[in-house]
């Protein structure tokens, strides 16, 4: 006599906390379900954001790297000089599927100076590949976090400066609306994000409910 053991499919949603970071793990059980865990921002007891540990942002999804050389900006660019931008992978996966940046989204912009010394007034130099700009030393970081409730006064996003030099600050306070959010609200293309400068973000279709209405 043969016996058949019925298959049991377990669908789980696990939430755990590790070192003050909420990590969500969800099995891919339905269309749109996330297939990876998410790293969410950590804060101190006084509300300062903590620098993500162990340079983990360098393992995230690379979005792009605009360049604002000091030599082309009066000797001191506002964000010198390479803007190496990464997005937390779970947030990117959700954005690709929905066209919406979910709460908890983290953009990490690691600044990096051009390789010196420059050989020309515009700050460029010549290497075997040609004349141009080449990445040099790291130079601090800026971080943007989406939290519709915590940052309701600045359009749902919080902006953080972890120094524009090395070493990066271990913690930092959210910036005021006039320092960061105002410019994003006025000029960024989609949900206060400069998607117009990052092709892999800009090519994601808008949700049907907002199609054609992005900034």
How would you describe each model-predicted region?
Residues 10-20:
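Bacterial N-terminal signal peptides
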Residues 31-100:
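N-terminal secretory signal peptides
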Residues 27-36, 56-59, 98, 102-215:
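Sequence context surrounding c-type heme c attachment/ligation sites in exported
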Residues 1-12:
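Bacterial N-terminal signal peptides that target proteins for export
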């Amino acid at each position: 006599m043969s016996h058949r053991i019925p298959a049991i499919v377990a669908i789980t949603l696990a939430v755990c906390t590790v070192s003050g970071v909420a990590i969500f793990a969800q099995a891919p059980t339905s269309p749109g379900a996330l297939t990876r865990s998410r790293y969410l921002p950590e804060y101190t007891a006084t509300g300062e954001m903590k620098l993500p540990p162990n340079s983990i942002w360098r393992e995230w999804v690379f979005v792009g790297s605009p360049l604002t050389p000091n030599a082309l900006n009066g000797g001191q660019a506002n964000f010198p000089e390479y803007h190496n931008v990464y997005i937390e992978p779970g947030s990117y996966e959700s954005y690709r599927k929905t066209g919406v940046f979910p709460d908890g989204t983290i953009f990490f912009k690691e600044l990096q100076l051009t390789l010196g010394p420059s050989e020309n007034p515009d700050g460029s130099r010549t290497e075997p590949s040609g004349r141009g700009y080449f990445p040099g030393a790291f130079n601090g970081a800026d971080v943007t976090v989406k939290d519709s409730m915590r940052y309701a006064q600045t359009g749902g996003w919080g902006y953080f400066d972890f120094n524009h030099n090395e070493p990066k600050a271990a913690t930092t306070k959210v910036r005021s609306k006039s320092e960061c959010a105002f410019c994003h609200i006025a000029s960024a293309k989609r949900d206060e994000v400069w998607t117009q400068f990052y092709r892999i973000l800009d090519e994601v279709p808008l949700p049907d409910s907002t199609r054609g209405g992005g900034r």
